[in-house]
């Protein structure tokens, strides 16, 4: 070739590359926009993108689409037959692939566009192309659930036994998407029972149906004798997978076939523990109604109650306690559920466990009570709640009253008090702590009120510095107020008398003028 010819050829090549690059940039934007609507987004785990070498970059460049090729794929996505016809007449390559190795047929099948699929198959579109995740059009037809498209693809010679990179066949995809007609066609018409194989996770189609909670599919696979009690590579049965996602109806159907409601997976976790860990309250209630073993011995030892406390599922906590779950059961660290809740500073869970009458004296492997754990973790609100509870239950025991059956009329709570009824007395206590009491004087008061040394230390462990005694004293006074209201006493009157008894007569006098404001409200106060 002469130099001029070579120059023209190089110019044409450069122009073509520029054209393809511009089209690729536009096409990438369109692909990203369109991906959200495509069914195959969730069909395969997307591998992590690695850096491209020179050879990879060159390959990627060849995958970029020209404008007409991009338009043709977009026409297939939107079922635009007129545009597909026009572009086909312009000799567009109908089998061209995009950067994900997908053809126009992938898009048409994925969106159930019968007309576009028919057009492509009549013009000899390839049915054997797998995208970068191994997905073929037969997989997409099974996923999208169009029996008509499936029939067309089978007639065109699509590989009925193809698997993607995750080892999933058309039967897996149809099962996962709950397309019963597709499953019936594959098994009863095409006799493809050999597709009933585990995927790369060790899951047969039956396990996928259970994981998705597809009751109709579970029943159909059972009818077709494709059910299994086998476990996947994680040691999960169909029951475990259904429980993980809270599929109560599916669990009910599965339990009708297998009676071992307490079967463990490879991690020694039962269905109840899976359901509690994930906070599936309705499923937990169903399993409890089926007499599931509440206190199954497992390693590592985390009871259902520990699991719901760890994962903050308070509704499930109430269900377990109503079913008589051992409230003081120990885990491998010899922690009760209260220890765990206190360590996390979870006020609502601590409140629930305290009101249920848990053991406040239980110690873990380090010899720490829940109070010591909360104090160490700097959860001052929980520390206050635990001290209130210790004093409350000590008072009930002294008066021989049932912990679970309070005789007094107040609403029991150990939370911080924000009620209007106690506003005046709380104002007095704040003034007393921050303006009247000197360093070390609140401890004298606390001991006169029978606070234990552990309780005083727990209060002192939060906050530090020269002025910290004011905050400590205020917290102790509020805890005392809880006990006074608990016994239906008059807070202002009792405060006056006890200040005198503790050796603070001048401070006692300063409380007198609050009495008239609190007399009418003290009997109505809610314990906090």
UniProtKB/Swiss-Prot annotation:
Keywords: ANK repeat, Repeat. ANK repeats lie at residues 67-96, 100-129, 133-162, 166-197, 201-230, 234-263, 267-296, 300-329, 333-362, 366-395. SMART domains: ANK (SM00248). This is Ankyrin repeat and death domain-containing protein 1B. It comes from Homo sapiens (Human). It comes from the Eukaryota. The keyword Repeat applies. The keyword Isomerase does not apply. The lineage of its organism: Eukaryota, Metazoa, Chordata, Craniata, Vertebrata. One of its GO terms (biological process) is signal transduction. Residues 427-515 form the Death domain.
């Amino acid at each position: 070739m002469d130099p001029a010819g070579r120059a023209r050829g190089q110019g044409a090549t450069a122009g073509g590359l520029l054209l393809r690059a511009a089209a690729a940039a536009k096409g990438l934007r369109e692909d990203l926009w369109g991906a959200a609507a495509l069914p195959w987004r969730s069909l395969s785990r997307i591998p992590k993108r690695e850096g491209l070498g020179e050879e990879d970059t060159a390959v990627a460049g060849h995958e970029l689409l020209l404008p007409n090729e991009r338009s043709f794929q977009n026409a297939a996505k939107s079922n635009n037959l007129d545009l597909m016809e026009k572009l086909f007449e312009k000799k567009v390559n109908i089998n061209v692939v995009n950067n994900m190795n997908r053809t126009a047929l992938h898009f048409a099948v994925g969106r159930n566009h019968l007309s576009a699929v028919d057009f492509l198959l009549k013009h000899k579109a390839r049915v054997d192309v797998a995208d970068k995740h191994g997905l073929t059009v037969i997989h997409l037809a099974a996923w999208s659930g169009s029996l008509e498209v499936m029939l067309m693809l089978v007639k065109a010679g699509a590989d009925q036994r193809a698997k993607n990179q995750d080892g999933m066949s058309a039967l897996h995809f149809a099962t996962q998407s709950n397309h019963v007609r597709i499953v019936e066609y594959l098994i009863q018409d095409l006799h493809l029972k050999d597709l009933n194989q585990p995927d790369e996770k060790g899951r047969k189609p039956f396990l996928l149906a259970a994981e998705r909670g597809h009751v109709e599919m579970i029943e159909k696979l059972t009818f077709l004798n494709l059910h299994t009690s086998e476990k996947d590579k994680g040691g999960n049965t169909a029951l475990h997978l259904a429980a993980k996602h809270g599929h109560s109806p599916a669990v009910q159907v599965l339990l009708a076939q297998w009676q071992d409601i307490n079967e463990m997976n490879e991690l020694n976790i039962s269905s109840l523990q899976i359901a509690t860990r994930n906070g599936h309250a309705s499923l937990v209630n169903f399993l409890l109604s089926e007499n599931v073993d509440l206190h199954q011995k497992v390693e590592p030892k985390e009871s259902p109650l520990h699991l719901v406390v760890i994962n903050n599922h308070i509704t499930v906590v109430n269900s377990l306690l109503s079913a008589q779950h051992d409230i003081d059961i120990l885990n491998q660290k010899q922690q009760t559920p209260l220890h765990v809740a206190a360590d996390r500073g979870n006020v609502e869970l601590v409140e629930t466990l305290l009101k249920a009458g848990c053991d406040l004296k239980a110690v873990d492997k380090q010899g720490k009570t829940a109070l010591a754990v909360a104090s160490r973790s700097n959860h001052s609100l929980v520390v206050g709640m635990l001290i209130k509870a210790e004093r409350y239950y000590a008072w009930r025991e002294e008066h021989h009253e049932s912990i679970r059956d309070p005789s007094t009329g107040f609403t029991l709570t150990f939370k911080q008090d924000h009620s209007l009824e106690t506003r005046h007395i709380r104002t007095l206590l704040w003034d007393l702590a921050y303006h009247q009491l000197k360093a070390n004087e609140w401890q004298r008061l606390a001991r006169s009120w029978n606070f234990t040394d552990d309780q005083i230390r727990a209060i002192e462990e939060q906050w530090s510095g020269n002025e910290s005694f004011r905050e400590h004293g205020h917290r102790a006074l509020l805890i005392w107020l809880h006990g006074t209201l608990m016994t239906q006493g008059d807070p202002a009157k009792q405060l006056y008398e006890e200040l005198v008894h503790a050796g603070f007569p001048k401070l006692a006098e300063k409380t007198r003028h609050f009495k008239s404001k609190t007399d009418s409200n003290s009997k109505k106060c809610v314990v906090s």
